[in-house]
UniProtKB/Swiss-Prot annotation:
The Q motif is unique to and characteristic of the DEAD box family of RNA helicases and controls ATP binding and hydrolysis. One of its GO terms (molecular function) is RNA helicase activity. SMART domains: DEXDc (SM00487), DUF4217 (SM01178), HELICc (SM00490). Residues 8-26, 710-719 have a biased composition (Basic residues). It comes from Emericella nidulans (strain FGSC A4 / ATCC 38163 / CBS 112.46 / NRRL 194 / M139) (Aspergillus nidulans). GO terms for cellular component: nucleolus; nucleus; small-subunit processome. Pfam families: CTE_SPB4 (PF13959), DEAD (PF00270), Helicase_C (PF00271). Interacts with the U3 and U14 snoRNAs. Associates with pre-ribosomal complexes. This is ATP-dependent RNA helicase dbp4. Its main location: nucleus.
Length: 812
């Protein structure tokens, strides 16, 4: 029986191995044929369906299961270039299927390279918002369901630790810039050295000033030898942006570049000129008139979204209201987008967080309550409706001061909007209702104040001052339309007024003052002010510094330091001898001897003779080769003892630099005109100097970047090594043998006789390594008897000799 079973098993194993080899061979043949089809792909041909492209069977099955069969224009042109491995800049209208244009090449390129979990991260997709990243990830799951790749979603608002545990096993990642950079800096086992493809969805938004530093930091972690795909409805062509992404000869694919309009053809676009204080009235009237439709209302700030949502929710317009802004938690944002997508009739108040890429089904209206910052933002906002050849309508609310500038910006982008007027009989005023609610609810009033400030700030920071002019807006009336008792104070507006007053010319101020004086002369003269009562506190504050001598004393002092003649002063006293010069000495030893000799003489004639003696010159000390110091007082004599104080009397030194040969030169040497002309034309010298300096700074910049990159790499490696050591220590601690608690029955069995090994021989007890083990308790006699019986029973079962010895013992 045994040989026959072995023969059957061996035959079955051989057949299974043979079928496995055939399957692998068939897969390799399909793969090689697929690679050949991609190499022979014609980039100029126009493809209509996914089956016409060289796509693998798993991808084609996923597309068919998700009901994707026909190619759009952007998909037909971009996928063929991406399959060839070229960098692509894709630009197409909103709702034209740009997501599949980069997801299909990702799956195909990784499939052709037989990517597995051991190869690490193969593709990275960066999205500007969390909602768009979730949407891309869901599409990737649908069309990639038959592949074996592992895909992950990395966005803010989720647990960082859970993402770190799974990140090292991912092949495809969909992420937002901030969270991706956090993982690149902090996650130890996350490597990107083997990355094959980088995709930036809504690339113009990702590469603007808001994400510039983050994107630059992410690019620094990625290998330069990769394929890069950029997609957006308004694509960038700036050389600086393309150089930052290390694009190599990119293919610019703009399928609607020659179209008459940059927006979908079935989109009806209108604008309404309504003053700022009447915007909320117009919006409320519009919502009440369209209760059986699905609408998105865009505003410029999250505070406005919250205020309009809370106030309209209290007034109950008769349609479900939702609000979406960046300050909400991720769970709430996801719940709101899901509810709005599934709703048949609803109104969503949102900021620009929902303006790009999000695919809400069957949106009827897009209302822009606030003027967009530029034409690109307008195009992305209205792109939430009229998607996939469906009908849609968009309305833009404009203040009279914004109309001219915004229409000019839209014309430059080939966007045509028609003006419509609001029917007066349909418009309802909600000003009194808002005032009543703000009076009763302080929180709503505070929210309204914040909404007012955030709107004014959003207008103030705009660069396009032709369209956004804060001075032409009626802010007081706008505050009243929000239900506020008055316009809140805004610091930056007050600062502008102060700056204007400060920068006003003196001539204007002089003319103004002159006009005021002339008016006063023409009219009645000003009456003198009545004498006010001056208290002791007023006199105290009017006091001058006590250590400063009065003015009348300064009149007594001549310029040379001598006391002025009393005859020349108006306040001369009759006592002329009250202030008189006693003696005056000059510095020096001779003057001191003269003092001693004059002190011995007491006659008036001797003192007069000394006063008229010829004065000697003061001492002159040579400090340096060029500088000298006159010693004419004792204070000057003390200066000679301090080198630090003498420095201010010395001249400034000259700084010398030494060339390679050791010769000294001044720091700045003037060149002759002839020598300058001998070196060529001035413009040529300037251009040559700029080129040399640019090359030098570029080399230095590259060296600095390489050093910084090396430091970051070393720091990351140290952190990873430290984390590996911690993990290894934790594993060692888990593998350490634990002490087993004492068991009476087991110890009794050991003490009751013997323990028998599998060979039937007694094993010597191993010495215990424990420091201290408690002594076992005394075993009762009935347990000993039970142990002996058990031992006897175990011995009886083993061999025939044991059975005979047991019977002999019982009989005897």
């Amino acid at each position: 029986m045994a040989p026959s079973n072995g023969h059957r098993n061996g035959k079955h194993a051989k057949s299974s191995n043979k079928s496995g080899n055939l399957k692998r061979k068939r897969v390799q043949e399909d793969l090689s044929s697929l690679i050949k089809r991609v190499e022979d792909l014609d980039l100029k041909a126009k493809y209509e369906s996914f089956s016409d492209l060289p796509i693998s069977e798993p991808t084609l099955s996923g597309l068919t299961s998700s009901h994707f069969k026909t190619l759009t224009d952007i998909q037909s042109r971009a996928i063929s270039h991406a399959l060839k491995g070229r960098d692509v800049l894709g630009a197409a209208k909103t709702g034209s299927g740009k997501t599949l244009a980069f997801l299909v090449p990702i799956l195909e390129n990784l499939y052709r390279k037989q990517w597995s979990d051991h190869d690490g991260l193969g593709a990275l997709i960066i999205s500007p918002t969390r909602e768009l990243a979730i949407q891309i990830f869901e599409v990737l799951r649908k069309i990639g369901r038959y592949h074996t790749f592992s895909a992950g979603l990395v966005i803010g608002g989720k647990s960082l630790k859970e993402e770190q545990e799974r990140l090292g096993r991912m092949n495809i990642l969909v992420c937002t810039p901030g969270r991706m950079l956090q993982h690149l800096d902090q996650t130890a086992f996350f490597e990107t050295y083997n990355l094959q493809m980088l995709v930036l969805d809504e690339a113009d938004r990702i590469m603007d000033m808001g994400f510039q530093k983050t994107v630059d930091a992410i690019i620094g972690h990625l290998p330069p030898e990769r394929q890069t795909l950029l997609f957006s409805a308004t694509q960038t062509k700036k050389v600086s942006d393309l150089a930052r992404l290390s694009l190599q000869d990119p293919e610019y694919v703009a399928v609607h570049e020659a179209a008459s309009s940059a927006t979908p053809s079935k989109l009806q676009q209108h604008y309404v000129v309504t003053p700022l204080p009447q915007k909320l009235d117009t919006l409320w009237s519009f919502i009440r008139s369209n209760l059986k439709s699905k609408t998105i209302v865009f505003m410029s700030s999250g505070k406005q979204v919250r205020f309009v949502y809370e106030s309209f929710r209290h007034m109950q317009p008769g349609i479900p209201l939702l609000h979406l802004h960046g300050r909400q938690k991720q769970g709430g944002r996801l719940d709101i987008t899901t509810r709005f997508s599934q709703a048949q009739h609803a109104v969503l108040f949102s900021t620009d967080v929902a303006a790009r890429g999000l695919d809400f089904p069957a949106v009827d209206w897009v209302i822009q309550l606030d003027c967009p910052e530029d034409a690109d933002t307008y195009i992305h906002r209205v792109g939430r409706t009229a998607r996939y050849e469906r009908d849609g309508r968009a309305v833009l609310f404009l203040d009279p001061s914004e109309e001219k500038g915004m229409l000019r910006r839209l014309e430059q982008k080939r966007v045509t909007v028609e003006r419509i007027n609001v029917r007066a009989n349909k418009q309802q005023s909600i000003k009194n209702q808002l005032q009543n609610m703000c009076f009763k609810d302080p929180e709503l009033k505070y929210l309204g104040q914040k909404a007012f400030i955030s709107y004014v700030k959003s207008v103030y920071i705009q660069k396009d001052k032709e369209t956004f002019n804060l001075k032409e807006l009626k802010l007081d009336d706008f505050a009243a339309s929000l239900g506020l008792p008055g316009a809140p104070r805004i610091k930056f507006i007050k600062g502008d007024d102060t700056k204007e007053r400060k920068n006003a010319s003196r001539a204007t101020a002089y003319l103004t003052s002159g006009d005021e004086e002339s008016d006063e002369e023409g009219g009645k003269k000003k009456q003198p002010k009545e004498k006010e009562v001056r208290t002791k506190y007023d006199r105290m504050f009017e006091r001058r510094n006590q250590d400063v001598l009065a003015e009348h004393y300064s009149k007594l002092i001549n310029d040379d330091g001598t006391i002025a003649d009393s005859k020349n002063t108006e306040e001369a006293d009759e006592d002329e001898d009250f202030l008189s010069v006693k003696r005056r000495f000059d510095a020096g030893d001779d003057a001191l001897h003269a003092e001693d000799s004059s002190a011995s003489d007491s006659d008036a004639s001797d003192s007069e003779a000394e006063d008229h003696t010829e004065k000697k010159d003061p001492k002159v000390v040579k400090i340096s080769d060029k500088d000298t110091l006159v010693i004419d007082s004792k204070r000057r004599e003390k200066l000679l003892k301090s080198k630090k104080k003498l420095l201010k009397f010395k001249g400034k030194g000259t700084k010398l630099v030494y060339d390679d040969e050791g010769n000294a030169h001044e720091l700045y040497e003037m060149e002759d005109e002839e020598a300058f002309k001998a070196r060529g034309d001035a413009k040529e010298q300037q251009a040559r100097f700029l080129a040399e300096e640019a090359a030098r700074t570029q080399r230095a910049d590259m060296e600095d970047k390489e050093i910084a990159k090396q430091k970051r790499r070393e720091k990351k490696e140290k952190r990873k090594a430290r984390e590996r050591e911690l993990l290894a220590e934790e594993e060692r601690e888990e593998r350490v043998a634990q002490l087993v608690p004492f068991d009476e029955d087991e110890d009794m069995g050991d003490a009751g006789g013997y323990s028998q090994s599998s060979d039937g021989e007694e094993e010597a007890p191993r010495p215990s390594k424990r420091a201290k083990v408690e002594e076992p308790k005394a075993v009762p006699w009935y347990k000993k008897e039970a142990g002996k019986k058990n031992d006897a029973g175990e011995k009886q079962i083993q061999t025939l000799e044991d059975l005979e010895s047991l019977a002999t013992g019982l009989l005897g």
